Amino acid sequence: VEDTRQRALKTIGMLRDNGVQHVRTHIDVTDPSLTALEAMLRVKKEAAHLIDLQIVAFPQEGIESFPGGRELMTRAIEMGADVVGGIPHYENTRDKGVSSLVFLMDLAERHGCLVDVHCDETDDPQSRFLEVLA
């Protein structure tokens, strides 16, 4: 936690020195310990006077295809992440991709969060999750 915290604070200092006032950062919440999220939530509080830091709970390994993915996403939002993230084309099947979108939209609605979905970032023409999201 401390190493991540120190590196993030150093980066925020550099960003602020160059006029950056807002950052949206994606934190991988498929780490069951949620160590990076814990560190960045501390950084957000410590650096609030310097920069507006928005934290995305991002399921880098998927929500439905990763063991405990739904629980980790829910826990991340309950801990204080600002935005619900998603990456449906990383799920093992199309059905799981669709299910992950339904889950993340419901989670965001229940907690009043914004949504940040990395959608169809692939060369596969059959990856059409944007249609589901819309």
Which residues does each PLM region occupy?
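Active-site mouth loops of central-metabolism enzymes
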Residues: 1-6, 56-68, 88-95
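A general secondary-structure boundary signal
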Residues: 42, 52-58
